[in-house]
Amino acid sequence: MAALINALDSTPKQCGQNGAVEYGWSNDIREQVLQFSGQIVRTDESKIEIMADKLNKILRSLSWNNSCNVLSDAENKELMVVLYKLIALTRDIVDGKGEYALAYMQVFVWYEFYPELAMFALDKFVLMDNEHPYGSWKDMKYFCNYVRLKTKNDNHPLIDYACNLIIKQIVADQQSNNKALVGKWVPREKSRKFGWIFIILAGKFSPQYLSTATTHEQRVKALTKCKMEFRKVCSALNKELDTVQIKQCAKVWSTIDHTKTTSITNSRQKKAFLNVTKAGKQRSEEDDRIVCAENYKNRIQAATSGVGPEIKGKRVGLDDFAKEAMKLIEQSLYGTSNVNQFEKDALNSQWRDNSKQTGALGEMVAMVDTSGSMTGAGAIYPALSLGIRVAEKSKLGKRIITFSAEPTWHNLEGINDYTECVRELHKASWGMNTNFMKAFDMILNAIIEKKLKPDEAKGFILAVFSDMQFDEARGGDMETIYEVMTKKYADAGRKLHGEPYELPHLLFWNMTCGSGFPVLSTFKNTSFISGYNPSQLNLFCEKGLGFLSTMTPWSMLVQSIDKPRYKCMELKMMEFFGYPDYQ
């Protein structure tokens, strides 16, 4: 209870963009950590910088506490571990949010305080024992570019460390039959964005040439030799990797094995594989491309009919699914080009494959915000996909509420294809204001109409996928949406049964980076999550409503990072600070 009082005392209320009362950034350090985690969602560079400033201040406060003891040792350790493991959760493409830019920002800020911990985290983006790392080798060149833009220093220690990781893996791959994909992601010399990294890597791979050069002319010749040798090594590695891109460059498209093509390549190159232009017309008359297209069509047909496995879609972003579905729908509605049925079938197959990473959910109802702020920010796309995923996995059946100026109840039973689900949701009111209370009243009115008993009225999870910029609710002075909802529910229960209704478990899933919060870290029977990755829904799989009623946003955050994959981060933190007794 003391934690609740402290959070309330330390966290100001404010009016959000659309008039609803919300909580602002707190002065309480624990609350700040929770709020920071809830704003880790894909955004632009300016907001990433705001998040970097928030993280800097939190780390500064926790570091300062080590000498001033404002928090107990146990409290300080807990917050440091949670904050450090957030790096893993942010980048993890398997079981986390899968965000790269926000992860790079966190590593960079941590480096300012604890360089060793920052480098260890970066290491885990590409190297993990006996399991998939948090990211991929693609991260190294993008991270180097991020640091360069931040520091204007090509020789920054973090860049040096990342390049050393690449070189070490290349050397290992030369001697191994089980190669990593580092060769695929090594920057090319002619790349405008990453060519400068190639020069650094070439010098590191053959330092013996540069070490003996004493004059400028000798250094130029030595570097030329370094680059030539490094090009040969990278070319040889890529040939052994036998990637799709290598076959495309070699003009042997017909030899591509579409059962092995990665989910991202499948997503981005459907039209290329089908040998069609954006307008749906044949792209090339070369036999090689025509055979490739026929092979790909056969692959799609096998997946659609159930004869073959689904087309890989595990790593495709939920926003990309919805964007492609919307394009296909618009093409069919307005006749801007020929809609290729194979493209739709491939997308639906990838969706089915992607769905396998989410387990069965309990009694959960999805509410998807389709207001103008969501469409303008592009957050509408992942929100639609998350809503459909919940509907597919919920015990309550395939149903979704969308809300803008008016709420709409969608029954998706009998609609099997993802693209058709998106088409159905697109019929609702989009692009208007964010009248969340009207959507909430739709549910409450149904409960009142059916005269549900108090234990029935709270017997589900309400998952709200929104940017949290709700319209003003008609409550008392400075009452938040949550407070207004609590009172409405309680009053309805008293009127019907003489005892208050309790709210269902409220899952506020934040879809954009902002500065307002619907609940505090200590509010029971609520969750506050953010991001585009559906794997976070697994936190609610096989969880009884009794268990969820005791959960708070803070306990849910702790649970989200309490995974075996992130244990190495915790152990590193304990080793670094010398507190092995941390539990």
State the predicted function of each range.
Residues M1-P382, E392-Q583:
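Long lumenal/extracellular ectodomains of secretory and single-pass membrane proteins
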